[in-house]
């Protein structure tokens, strides 16, 4: 088949499978709803064991210091469990040692149905694991050695991941208020989107619909990650991003045709269509926003990311501009 005829086929496939502007608008509306979740009121309890070191308590306290007006932070210092627990709290964190008073307080908080995480001070606690095992306590905790940077980083990641998983209804508000929650939440979004797109890509009866579904999922991922880092996405940016993203996920039909123009191994194409591309794009977005990237640079970031990946950009370029034009129409 002549080259021009093949490109005509590409154009017809693009028009058939690229999501409609209305679908992209719906994604934008969903992202706008998510953005509003950032303003939800947060009620956080912080219990500090008087036996814990100042270094450990300072490290954890500083994580929750914020100027965000919708956050209520209650800090209580304790020697025993004779403290008041606000049952309306969204979550609680205990900074403590391996003492019975910490365990008693944990049970008291759990009785109030308030999710609780314990940060044990490694400088004053001897053997936390055996301490908890003896009391048949299975729970969420980590050991912090406040003088070690790696230990502090691990604690932040574990605590941030815990908050994102436990405080599901308010996870975007937590990410907006406390930066250490942002990356774990963003990576969770990337992971879930990659899994969903992988499932879409391998279902046979979705062969005519998988392109727009995967594209819309990736656009939604982009919007959610941007929201996590306090960035606002508008419809025009979504359309522009769609033009870049669709060139990367066009595997089956389009690449079968373009592959006759510029040969590509089948395993490269299929690997990119689902898990690979979504992971690459998602991680690039997270790193970009973590470094303070602005929303205006997102489209250029996507272009560079896809060109530098194993997408085999040489095959994408002949149709990328046509795809982008179709999406904007």
Per-range role (PLM):
Residues 3-78:
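Conserved G1/Walker A P-loop phosphate-binding module
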Residues 56, 76-77, 117, 124-172:
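Canonical P-loop GTPase G-domain recognition
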Residues 170, 233, 289-292:
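Long, hydrophobic, amphipathic alpha-helical segments used as structural scaffolds
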Residues 183-284:
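Membrane-inserting effector segments that mediate pore formation, membrane fusion
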Residues 269-329:
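Charge-biased C-terminal accessory regions appended to nucleic-acid-, cytoskeletal NTPase
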